[in-house]
Amino acid sequence: MVVIQNIIHDSSINEYDLSNTLQEVIKELDRGESELLIRLVNETEIKNLNKVYRHQDKLTNVLSFQSDLPIEIDEAVLGDVVICTQVVLKESIEQHKSFNNHLTHMAIHGMLHLLGYDHIDTKDAQQMENLEIKILAKIGINNPY
Protein backbone atom coordinates (compact mmCIF):
# COMPACT_ATOMS: atom_id res chain seq x y z
CA MET A 1 0.00 0.00 0.00
CA VAL A 2 1.26 3.46 -0.91
CA VAL A 3 -0.04 6.46 1.01
CA ILE A 4 0.50 9.97 -0.32
CA GLN A 5 0.48 12.81 2.22
CA ASN A 6 0.18 16.00 0.20
CA ILE A 7 0.50 18.37 3.15
CA ILE A 8 1.17 21.33 0.87
CA HIS A 9 -2.16 20.68 -0.90
CA ASP A 10 -0.62 20.91 -4.37
CA SER A 11 -3.56 20.19 -6.65
CA SER A 12 -1.29 19.76 -9.69
CA ILE A 13 -0.12 16.40 -8.33
CA ASN A 14 -2.20 13.39 -9.29
CA GLU A 15 -1.89 11.46 -6.05
CA TYR A 16 -3.92 8.54 -7.37
CA ASP A 17 -1.64 8.01 -10.38
CA LEU A 18 1.52 8.43 -8.29
CA SER A 19 0.28 5.94 -5.70
CA ASN A 20 -0.71 3.38 -8.34
CA THR A 21 2.59 3.74 -10.18
CA LEU A 22 4.60 3.24 -7.00
CA GLN A 23 2.45 0.24 -6.05
CA GLU A 24 3.31 -1.33 -9.41
CA VAL A 25 7.01 -0.65 -8.80
CA ILE A 26 6.76 -2.32 -5.38
CA LYS A 27 5.25 -5.40 -7.04
CA GLU A 28 7.93 -5.32 -9.76
CA LEU A 29 10.60 -5.36 -7.04
CA ASP A 30 8.94 -8.40 -5.41
CA ARG A 31 8.09 -6.48 -2.25
CA GLY A 32 4.51 -7.81 -2.19
CA GLU A 33 2.28 -6.05 0.30
CA SER A 34 4.85 -3.53 1.47
CA GLU A 35 3.71 -0.21 2.88
CA LEU A 36 5.25 3.07 1.77
CA LEU A 37 4.47 6.64 2.79
CA ILE A 38 5.24 9.48 0.38
CA ARG A 39 5.12 12.87 2.11
CA LEU A 40 5.08 15.93 -0.16
CA VAL A 41 6.46 18.97 1.67
CA ASN A 42 7.68 22.53 1.20
CA GLU A 43 11.24 23.88 1.30
CA THR A 44 11.07 24.82 4.99
CA GLU A 45 10.19 21.29 6.09
CA ILE A 46 12.72 19.48 3.86
CA LYS A 47 15.51 21.86 4.93
CA ASN A 48 14.66 21.31 8.60
CA LEU A 49 14.55 17.51 8.20
CA ASN A 50 17.85 17.57 6.29
CA LYS A 51 19.45 19.63 9.07
CA VAL A 52 18.11 17.48 11.92
CA TYR A 53 18.70 14.03 10.41
CA ARG A 54 21.63 14.54 8.02
CA HIS A 55 23.28 17.56 9.66
CA GLN A 56 23.15 19.44 6.35
CA ASP A 57 21.56 22.88 6.55
CA LYS A 58 20.42 23.03 2.94
CA LEU A 59 17.59 22.11 0.62
CA THR A 60 17.36 18.69 -0.96
CA ASN A 61 14.87 17.03 -3.27
CA VAL A 62 14.20 13.78 -1.40
CA LEU A 63 14.90 12.15 1.97
CA SER A 64 14.22 8.55 2.97
CA PHE A 65 13.48 7.31 6.47
CA GLN A 66 13.43 3.59 7.17
CA SER A 67 10.75 2.27 9.47
CA ASP A 68 11.65 1.98 13.14
CA LEU A 69 8.98 -0.64 13.87
CA PRO A 70 10.03 -3.89 15.58
CA ILE A 71 11.67 -6.38 13.22
CA GLU A 72 8.71 -8.79 13.32
CA ILE A 73 6.45 -6.04 11.93
CA ASP A 74 9.05 -4.25 9.84
CA GLU A 75 9.12 -6.65 6.86
CA ALA A 76 6.08 -5.11 5.23
CA VAL A 77 6.84 -1.47 6.08
CA LEU A 78 9.41 0.11 3.78
CA GLY A 79 9.35 3.51 5.47
CA ASP A 80 8.78 7.13 4.51
CA VAL A 81 9.97 9.11 1.51
CA VAL A 82 9.80 12.89 1.93
CA ILE A 83 9.86 14.92 -1.28
CA CYS A 84 10.09 18.69 -1.62
CA THR A 85 7.90 19.48 -4.61
CA GLN A 86 9.33 23.01 -4.92
CA VAL A 87 12.85 21.63 -5.36
CA VAL A 88 11.61 18.94 -7.77
CA LEU A 89 9.79 21.59 -9.82
CA LYS A 90 12.92 23.78 -10.01
CA GLU A 91 15.03 20.77 -11.03
CA SER A 92 12.52 19.68 -13.66
CA ILE A 93 12.57 23.15 -15.23
CA GLU A 94 16.39 23.37 -15.13
CA GLN A 95 16.76 19.86 -16.57
CA HIS A 96 13.94 20.23 -19.14
CA LYS A 97 11.97 17.32 -17.68
CA SER A 98 8.30 16.76 -17.03
CA PHE A 99 7.49 17.63 -13.41
CA ASN A 100 5.39 14.48 -12.97
CA ASN A 101 8.12 12.25 -14.42
CA HIS A 102 10.76 13.85 -12.20
CA LEU A 103 8.50 13.54 -9.14
CA THR A 104 7.96 9.85 -9.91
CA HIS A 105 11.71 9.39 -10.37
CA MET A 106 12.43 11.02 -6.99
CA ALA A 107 9.82 8.81 -5.29
CA ILE A 108 11.41 5.69 -6.81
CA HIS A 109 14.88 6.96 -5.91
CA GLY A 110 13.79 7.41 -2.29
CA MET A 111 12.13 4.00 -2.24
CA LEU A 112 15.33 2.35 -3.47
CA HIS A 113 17.19 3.95 -0.57
CA LEU A 114 14.69 2.25 1.76
CA LEU A 115 15.54 -1.06 0.07
CA GLY A 116 19.25 -0.60 0.79
CA TYR A 117 20.50 1.02 -2.40
CA ASP A 118 22.86 3.98 -2.15
CA HIS A 119 25.07 6.22 -4.26
CA ILE A 120 27.94 6.99 -1.93
CA ASP A 121 30.57 5.42 -4.17
CA THR A 122 30.69 5.18 -7.97
CA LYS A 123 29.95 1.45 -8.18
CA ASP A 124 26.89 1.68 -5.92
CA ALA A 125 25.69 4.81 -7.70
CA GLN A 126 25.90 3.08 -11.08
CA GLN A 127 23.98 0.06 -9.77
CA MET A 128 21.26 2.28 -8.31
CA GLU A 129 21.01 4.45 -11.44
CA ASN A 130 20.79 1.40 -13.69
CA LEU A 131 17.92 0.01 -11.63
CA GLU A 132 16.17 3.40 -11.67
CA ILE A 133 16.53 3.58 -15.47
CA LYS A 134 15.13 0.04 -15.83
CA ILE A 135 12.15 0.74 -13.55
CA LEU A 136 11.40 4.08 -15.18
CA ALA A 137 11.53 2.55 -18.67
CA LYS A 138 8.93 -0.04 -17.63
CA ILE A 139 6.53 2.75 -16.66
CA GLY A 140 7.23 4.82 -19.76
CA ILE A 141 9.69 7.38 -18.40
CA ASN A 142 12.90 8.07 -20.31
CA ASN A 143 16.38 7.78 -18.81
CA PRO A 144 16.65 10.76 -16.43
CA TYR A 145 20.44 10.78 -16.46
Curated annotation (Swiss-Prot):
Q: Which cofactor does it need?
A: Zn(2+)
One of the entry's Gene Ontology molecular-function terms is:
metalloendopeptidase activity
- List, alphabetically, the SUPFAM superfamilies matched: Metalloproteases ('zincins'), catalytic domain
Entry GO CC? cytoplasm
UniProt cross-references to InterPro entries, sorted A to Z: MetalPrtase_cat_dom_sf_prd (IPR023091), YbeY (IPR002036), YbeY_CS (IPR020549)
Family indicated by similarity: Belongs to the endoribonuclease YbeY family.
Name assigned to this protein: Endoribonuclease YbeY
